[in-house]
UniProtKB/Swiss-Prot annotation:
Organism encoding this protein: Tetrahymena thermophila (strain SB210)
Gene disruption: observed consequences: Knockout cells show deficiencies in cell multiplication and ciliary functions. Mutants move with greatly reduced velocities, have disturbed waveform of beating cilia and have stiffer cilia. Mutant cilia lack an adjacent portion of the radial spoke 3 stem region.
InterPro entries: CFAP61, CFAP61_dimer, CFAP61_N, FAD/NAD-bd_sf
Name under which the protein is recorded: Cilia- and flagella-associated protein 61
Broad class of where this protein is predominantly found: other
Length: 1699
């Protein structure tokens, strides 16, 4: 079992992190002489310069090539500082990756390419392996031996300790090189400065060919090279198999590092392990395997032990970790067999799904065509053909028998039709179309009866419309009778006709003679029916085949005289048949006659109708002579022939072709389904079926894959899914496991030697692995291993590290510029990358185009290509500096413009991930760069290289109103900037005053010498509040630690997932983070953000339960949730958004009751849930985490926004509450398209009275606590009035003073139908008094009545007239009770509440059930720790313990009154202390003290009318009693320029304390304002506002917002202005003059005085001119250094003193 190696790693000293930071302490072994070595700080430079004597400085100038020590420390790879026992700096050393003095390109491609010539110029011993990977160059070394009187022996000890520190910091190093400059050859002082070190620690490398040195720029001809191997300063460690006598040495190390193993397995565990050599774990489970014990020996002492074996549960590891990239630790052949089998399974599944889908499509297509009108008509035709004889005989019988025909009625005909259609059924689509509505979305479903279908079908063939209702019957009846009469007259002898007057009776008789019969006429039906049957499938098929065979002829018929196809409709369908016969196509007469009809019926041909007038057709001249004579006799009666109308049906070729093809499609399908019969068609279908069979055979043949046999095929043949792992045969296992490892701290840098020896023992294995608990820090050994990500569903409580044998070849890593020949090997590197084509193109461009701005580098290991990197030749540095805080990480003046590059693409074999920093360092060296940047665009998947870089905080340009500066650069500026067209991203404007559209990371050469250590502690942060986000931001900002397991529980996601524009907001937001800042943090990409809510806590099991029916383990739980609206929780209702979670649905299923059960008083079956009991759809809390998702504008039907904005019967929404959130929500609804008159805003009354004056701080804090629970929307009545007036003017219905009384619910659907609100009547107190009087009267009446025990005899009242009954006292009381309250009932589909604010009751019960202390708030220590050491809590739900009451005089112990971002920073410091990482931050405070919290707090919202609102106030709750009692001595400054009608303008208000410090600031306006600028005002003196108070009072400033946006004020908003003020203040405090003034001010304050203007002028006059000059010069320097953000200020050039 693999679990055998799950031992606690004994080597878990916290100092491992310090070693990674090069801040570990290495002391000399000599008791009388000890030194400390640490990584250098830039502050050390001045101290080092102080201890360098003048003669030593001259010697150093010859020995070392450096412009200044600061530049050396900043730009070189590694620098260390040497200290004595008194912590005094006694020296320093600097190391780089190329020799000092080297410049230029040696090979005309690479800079600093020393390995190109060093081996030709000097004769290195062949046994020494020197590569850039395992070697550094010493470029500076100094020890103040003269000042501190160090002996030569002590100097050597110091040098050894420095080198030991370097080797411990960089374990891969095997030696250090030093180039002794030729300029020192004749200088004895320089020689003496370093001679002892070179003689005793270094070895001089003989010169092979000094002429080669001549060609090397920067290297003196007489230069010498010295080499110091690792064993010169560090004892050689020998790795061997363990022996029993090693026990005593190893036990000492074990006991020193960990007592866990000794306590678990006994004192002689090591001896037993070594003796058996195959028992890897003792205890209850004992089994044998091939375990081995390896020992590291220095001289005759064992200093380390590694226990290894090959006993691994591979299947378990594959289930828990993402090991696919590493073949799941199998042999490649075995993994290939698994992958082949998985590919087969994947293909089989894919083919099965494709075949099933095709079968479904085929079946649905059959049903579609059968259900289609054409298919139904063809089926109908076949049915009629089968009954043709019966139908024709019946029709002939009726027509030929006058007696039957004259009695024929519509009903009888309908019965005939129904009888003829018996057995025919219309086909309807099956349920498949419901399952797959997307396949054939336009499928027809006919709802006609068979009789209706027949009649409508025959209408295509001439049956008149509305035929069954009599239309078209007895057509041409009059003409027929007249013709019959004429023929009859011709047969009789002619008589002389004499005119006589007509009589009425004769006329009536004539009309009756020509009147059509009233009985049913079957003749039109007979004609249409015969035509319908005439175009049978056989005829249609023959016709179609002839058309297909003569397609060229057909096309010509649709062309114009020039042979061009005419797209318009111009060919008459009625004549098309005759035209086709003219082309000798021999179309059958019945088809020719009915061509238009059957193409309409069976092809749905499209055409347009046109009526033209034509001459009637000529009679046939070969008529019978008698008839001709008859015509001649009646010639006198003939009228001249006139044109008659003719209907044209004009179509185009494409429409004709489409109709023929559609008819073919249906004919074939109906024949295949054996619905229609046709010999010709059957033959065609048979050929189609045969071709389909051949295609299917070819498809199956194509699917078959031929592979070469694999020896492991039999092991994987039974795999059925893609996740399973078969039993792994021994010869397929490819890993070794480290069960136990410990080593003396002094030899940790040699840990990898054990791994190399382990591979030599198990030579057939390629991987070595190790697991350890999450909380154990990474050792030096594990810093060389790759950490494997866990699978999402993994519950394994260890992390897994692996190391591949090939990584032992890291010494052979070689980086050079890419060549074209490398491109043939890049495919495996790019194959799994998302943007592989872009990387390929950019790499090719960098190789082939010399003018490209990109450079490509290839990484090789043992001649194999393992990586491709694409970087830029330069960067737009000005843009980076102006948009990001690059200065936080580098000294800009030490890194010229040419020293910067940008990483564009990376592709690296994952086995070599741990070598990323070395590769980046080599790229910088070969390009002569010192800084590398990496841009992360929005929604970019972060690459692995991101973890090696340092995140750079974004900057914001100083503004008040967010508008462009009133400033333009002069020509000189552009001349100084130069031409940026050839620079990478040169088009970016450094002064665009916009947020950068990307995030930035950076790494410098100096940073690369530090190892970024993984911290695997599982930190679960509950709540995405400002505190939680600030806490995570602080952890992520630690440069040298990579926190790999931070999980943020953010139900509904973080804010940036929902808000892109201010109008998207649905709630008020704090001013701690802007949306731009949150986006730049990229929290969703850098930590694991879970859309889940904590519902249970198991503190013993150290896990929490989520509402997604999942559990989440933790090592540290950090609760940062805020206070929420409790209105719904007080009513035991679940907010609608939360109800989508399965947890809450199951909760109601278990605890819920319907109304009937509630009214009956029936208890819940499973008891009562402590928080929730019911659910109403459409009722939301404003703090519902899914509020944004629920009210998202999706465009989907019946979504919330759709219901509120639809044109027909839109729904209404009611917002209840008095917080700023409610008004922001109203604005969000209006911005989402909800009409204002659909919005009801109901405001409850306040629960406490507003208070301004306080007797003491305690009274003020009590009042502030109430305000937290029931906050006002605005602190300024003027702002409140403006907003409410605007809302009411737009039609929003506002109801003030009402409380939520009842929610009307549809009991079946649980949908909100309406809301009832209630408030006390105006005469409420009077009514109460009247009720009491009436009750007293009832008591008196009952006491005086003889029948008091019976009460009022209501039977008498019911017997009499109700209208005349007297009103009883009880009825009067009922009437008074009804009048106590005024109710309003609002019909509303949605209700959003924002009532009293308090702790989430679910969180409260979690706290209560786990025994955490709660007293109105969760009680925490000053380090935010609860009673559980691994549970921290911070934010609005917390309160410091009462033990700190004496420390919080005048300050609130509750944290809801402090800035959340500041709290998060303090919380991060405390957690780092718990992890023993507190040294990584500058914050310092003890557990016995409360943290200092001073940052202002603020809130903002986007309000109706597109108004931006912000209110920020000082965090100042501790004021002296005299201050509390004193009246304000300064008026508020209020500037109101808002036009109420047009809603344009600004409103700003400054409130000052009695010392002239800005206490509060309020802004309201249509123009966005910089939040940081508003925040910067708070705590600022009124004197910084350019005499604003005086100018405004005198009317000189009409608009303060405009005034504060002028150029003079921009410096106030600079992000570093507050830091500048602080530094200036600290410098001033050093002055005695300032101290005297402060003492005077303190006495004045003790007497009750304030900094009134008179007193300020008085003390201002006492400030010395030197201090004023110092302040002025400091201000100029500040502006001069920040010209990229303050270009509008003119600063005179700085004077340079020249000695």
């Amino acid at each position: 079992m693999y679990s055998n190696n799950q031992l606690d790693n004994p080597n878990h000293s916290r100092s491992q992190y310090r070693n990674g930071d090069q801040s570990g302490i290495y002391a000399g072994s000599d008791e009388e002489f000890q030194v400390l070595v640490r990584k250098s700080d830039l502050d050390d430079v001045d101290e080092v310069l102080k201890i360098i004597a003048q003669h030593e400085r001259e010697a150093n100038d010859l020995l070392y090539d450096y412009p200044n020590l600061l530049s050396l420390f900043e730009k070189n790879y590694l620098s260390v500082t040497i200290l004595n026992q008194q912590q005094q700096i006694i020296g320093a050393a600097v190391f780089n990756d190329f020799p000092q003095g080297l410049t230029g390109q040696i090979d005309f491609q690479h800079e600093n390419f020393w390995e190109n010539w060093i081996f030709d110029a000097f004769n290195f011993d062949e046994s020494i392996c020197i590569t850039p990977f395992n070697t550094l160059w010493m470029t500076f070394f100094f020890v103040a031996k003269d000042q501190y009187k160090f002996s030569q022996e002590e100097e050597l000890i110091i040098c050894q300790k420095v080198f030991q520190n370097v080797y411990a910091t960089l374990p891969q190093l095997e030696g250090i090189l030093f180039l002794k400059r030729g300029e020192t050859m004749e200088d004895n002082g320089a020689q003496a400065q370093i001679s002892s070190i070179l003689e005793n620690i270094f070895i001089e490398v003989p010169v092979k060919d000094r002429d080669i040195i001549k060609r090397v720029r920067g290297i003196h001809l007489n230069s010498e090279v010295f080499y110091s191997p690792k064993h010169a300063c560090q004892e050689i460690i020998e790795i061997r198999m363990a022996r029993e006598q090693d026990h005593d040495d190893l036990a000492e190390i074990f006991n020193r590092q960990s007592e866990v193993l000794t306590a678990q397995f006994g004192e002689f565990f090591i001896a037993d392990l070594i003796a058996t050599q195959n028992l890897t774990r003792r205890g209850t489970r004992k089994f044998l395997n091939n375990g081995k014990a390896i020992v590291g020996q220095v001289r005759d002492k064992a200093v380390g032990l590694m226990s290894i074996s090959t006993d691994i549960d591979y299947k378990f590891l594959a289930q828990c970790f993402e090991l696919e990239t590493y073949d799941n630790l199998f042999k490649p052949d075995f993994m290939e067999a698994i992958q082949n089998k998985r590919d087969d399974i994947r293909r089989e599944n894919q083919y099965r799904e494709e075949d099933q889908y095709q079968e479904i499509v085929k079946k649905m297509n059959e049903e579609r065509m059968k259900s289609h009108f054409i298919g139904q008509r063809m089926t109908l035709q076949q049915h009629c053909r089968e009954k043709e004889q019966e139908i024709v005989m019946k029709i002939d019988e009726i027509i030929n028998n006058d007696a039957i025909q004259k009695n024929l009625t519509k009903k009888q005909v309908e019965e005939f039709l129904d009888e003829w259609l018996r057995g025919y059924e219309l086909h309807q689509p099956s349920d498949l179309f419901y399952q797959y509505p997307h396949i054939f979305p336009n499928t027809q479903s006919i709802i006609l009866t068979p009789r209706q279908l027949l009649i409508e079908t025959l209408e295509f063939f001439g049956l008149p419309q509305h035929y069954m209702n009599g239309a078209g019957h007895w057509k041409d009846w009059v003409q027929k009778k007249m013709e019959e009469k004429r023929i009859a007259q011709l047969k009789r002898p002619q008589k002389k006709v004499t005119k006589r007057p007509k009589r009425q009776k004769e006329e009536d008789k004539k009309e009756d003679e020509f009147k059509p019969p009233s009985y049913f006429d079957l003749t039109p039906f007979q004609s249409a029916f015969k035509k319908f049957l005439a175009v049978n499938p056989e005829g249609r098929t023959i016709f179609r085949q002839k058309i297909e065979a003569s397609m060229k002829v057909i096309k010509m018929m649709f062309c114009n005289e020039n042979g061009e196809m005419k797209e318009e409709r111009h060919v008459d369908l009625n004549d098309l048949g005759n035209e086709l016969n003219k082309q000798k196509m021999d179309i059958a007469p019945e088809v020719c006659e009915n061509l238009a009809s059957f193409l309409e019926c069976f092809g749905e041909i499209k055409y347009e109708e046109e009526i033209i007038m034509v001459n009637p057709p000529k009679e046939d001249t070969n008529q019978n002579a008698k008839i001709a004579q008859t015509k001649k006799m009646f010639a006198s009666e003939q009228t001249e022939s006139k044109p008659i109308p003719k209907l044209l049906k004009k179509t185009s070729f494409q429409e004709f072709f489409d109709a023929v093809y559609k008819m073919k499609e249906f004919d074939i399908m109906m024949n295949r389904l054996d619905i229609t019969k046709s010999t010709t068609l059957k033959a065609e279908v048979s050929q189609i079926v045969k071709e389909e069979a051949q295609q299917e055979k070819a498809k199956q043949e194509k699917r078959r894959i031929e592979r070469s046999p694999n020896p492991y095929d039999d092991y994987v043949k039974n795999l059925k899914d893609l996740d399973s792992i078969p039993e792994v045969p021994i010869d397929a296992q490819n890993a070794i496991v480290i069960n136990l490892f410990c080593i003396d701290e002094n030899f940790e840098s040699r840990s990898l030697d054990f791994v190399e020896y382990a591979f030599s023992i198990f030579g057939d294995r390629d991987y070595i692995i190790l697991t350890q608990p999450f909380t154990v820090p990474e050792t030096t050994l594990l810093q060389q291993f790759i950490k494997i990500p866990m699978k999402k569903n993994s519950t394994f409580d260890h992390v897994l590290y692996i190391y591949h044998k090939d990584c032992l070849l890291s010494n052979t890593l070689f980086i050079r510029k890419s060549k074209l020949e490398d491109m043939q090997y890049v495919a495996p590197l790019f194959s799994n990358l998302i943007n592989k084509q872009q990387i390929y193109d950019d790499t090719l461009e960098a190789i082939t185009q010399t003018a490209s701005r990109k450079v490509a580098f290839s990484v090789f290991c043992d001649q194999s290509l393992i990586g491709i990197y694409v970087v830029s030749k330069n960067v737009n540095l000005d843009y980076y500096i102006s948009h990001f805080c690059v200065q936080d990480h580098i000294i800009l003046k030490e890194h010229p413009m040419t020293c910067h590059t940008k990483l564009i693409h990376t592709a690296l074999n994952p086995l070599f991930t741990k070598n990323t920093r070395f590769i980046l360092k080599e790229i910088l060296r070969l390009m002569n760069k010192t800084c590398m940047y990496f841009e992360v665009q929005e929604k970019t998947l972060l690459p692995d290289v991101f973890n090696e870089l340092v995140f750079v905080r974004a900057r914001q340009f100083p503004h008040f109103l967010k508008r462009k500066w009133d400033f333009e650069h002069d020509k000189e500026h552009f001349e100084r900037a130069g031409d940026l067209t050839e620079v990478q991203d040169g088009k970016r404007d450094a002064f665009d005053q916009e947020q950068a559209p990307f995030s930035l990371s950076v790494i410098t050469k100096k940073m690369m010498s530090s190892v970024k250590v993984n911290n695997n502690t599982r930190i679960v942060v509950v709540g995405a509040s400002d505190t939680g986000i600030s806490f995570i931001e602080s952890l992520l900002s630690v440069k040298d630690i990579n926190f790999t397991h931070i999980t943020l529980l953010a139900p509904g996601g973080i804010m940036t997932m929902h808000i892109n524009l201010p109008g998207d907001q649905l709630k008020a937001l704090s001013t701690n983070y802007t949306l731009e800042e949150l986006k730049n943090l990229m929290l969703d990409a850098r930590v694991n953000v879970l859309d889940a809510k904590m519902v249970e806590l198991d503190k013993k099991g150290k896990k929490i339960k989520l509402d997604k029916n999942a559990e989440l383990p933790y090592d540290y739980l950090v609760n940062t949730v805020g206070l929420i609206d409790t209105e719904l929780q007080n009513r035991r209702l679940i907010s609608t958004g939360l109800f989508s979670s399965p947890y809450y649905q199951q909760l109601l299923d278990k605890y819920g009751r319907d109304r009937a059960q509630i009214e009956e008083g029936a208890p819940p079956i499973f008891g009562q849930h402590p928080v929730y009991g019911n659910y109403v759809q459409g009722v939301y809390s404003i703090d519902d985490p899914y509020l944004y998702e629920e009210f998202k504008k999706t465009g989907k039907k019946d979504s919330n926004i759709d219901l509120l904005t639809r044109k027909k019967r839109p729904q209404s929404i009611t917002i209840y509450g008095r917080t700023l959130h409610t008004i922001a929500f109203i604005s969000g609804m209006v911005n989402r398209g909800v009409h204002p008159n659909r919005i009801h805003y109901v405001i409850p009354p306040k629960v406490f009275e507003t208070q301004v004056q306080f007797k003491n701080n305690t009274e003020r804090l009590i009042y502030e606590d109430k305000r937290i629970n029931d906050p006002d929307p605005f602190d300024d009545p003027s702002v409140e009035q403006k907003i409410f007036e605007f809302m009411e003017s737009k039609g929003i219905q506002v109801h003030k003073g009402y409380n939520l009384h009842q929610i009307d619910v549809d009991e079946e659907t649980r949908i909100c139908q309406g809301v009832v609100f209630r408030k006390k009547a105006d005469n409420y107190e009077e009514i109460i008094q009247q009720i009491e009087i009436k009750k007293q009267q009832i008591l008196e009446r009952d006491a005086n009545s003889e029948n008091a025990d019976k009460g009022f005899d209501d039977t008498q009242s019911r017997d009499g007239d109700e209208e005349n009954q007297p009103i009883t006292l009880e009825q009067e009381i009922e009437e008074l009770e009804r009048n106590k309250f005024d109710d309003i009932e609002i019909t509303s589909r949605f209700l959003v509440t924002s009532g009293l604010v308090d702790i989430d009751k679910e969180i409260f019960y979690i706290i209560h059930e786990n025994g955490l202390v709660y007293n109105g708030r969760l009680i925490v220590k000053s380090n935010f720790q609860t009673t559980e050491k691994d549970i921290f809590c911070c934010g609005k739900i917390c309160e410091f313990s009462q033990r700190y009451k004496r420390l919080s005089i005048g300050r609130s112990l509750r944290l809801d009154k402090y800035n959340g971002r500041e709290l998060g920073q303090k919380l991060a410091k405390c957690l780092l202390d718990s992890l023993d990482l507190g040294y990584l931050t500058d914050q310092i405070y003890s557990l016995g003290e409360l943290p200092n919290l001073y940052m202002p707090i603020g809130i903002g919202a986007f309000l109706p009318g597109d108004l931006f609102y912000y209110h920020i106030k000082k965090n100042d709750y501790a004021r002296p009693s005299k201050t509390m009692e004193a009246e304000d001595n300064r008026q508020d400054i209020v500037s109101d320029n808002i036009d109420q009608k047009q809603q344009i303008g600004h409103y700003i208000k400054f409130k000052f304390d009695n010392n002239g410090i800005i206490d509060q600031v309020t802004y309201l306006g249509t123009e966005p304002v910089s939040v940081q600028s508003l925040v910067s005002f708070v705590g600022l003196s009124e004197k910084c506002l350019n005499q604003l108070d005086v100018r405004f009072k005198n009317g000189l400033i009409p608009n303060i917002s405009e005034f504060l946006s002028e150029n003079w004020a921009i410096g106030l908003y600079h992000e570093w202005f507050s830091e500048f003020r602080h530094i200036t203040k600290m410098e001033m405090l050093q002055s005695e003059n300032i101290q005297q003034i402060l003492d005077e001010a303190a006495k004045y304050a003790q007497g009750g005085g304030f900094l009134d203007p008179e007193f300020i002028e008085k003390i201002k006059a006492k400030i010395s001119p030197e201090i004023i000059s110092q302040i002025q010069q400091g201000t100029l320097d500040f502006i001069r250094e920040n010209q990229n953000h303050l270009p509008m200020y003119y600063v005179p050039p700085k004077k340079v003193n020249v000695d």
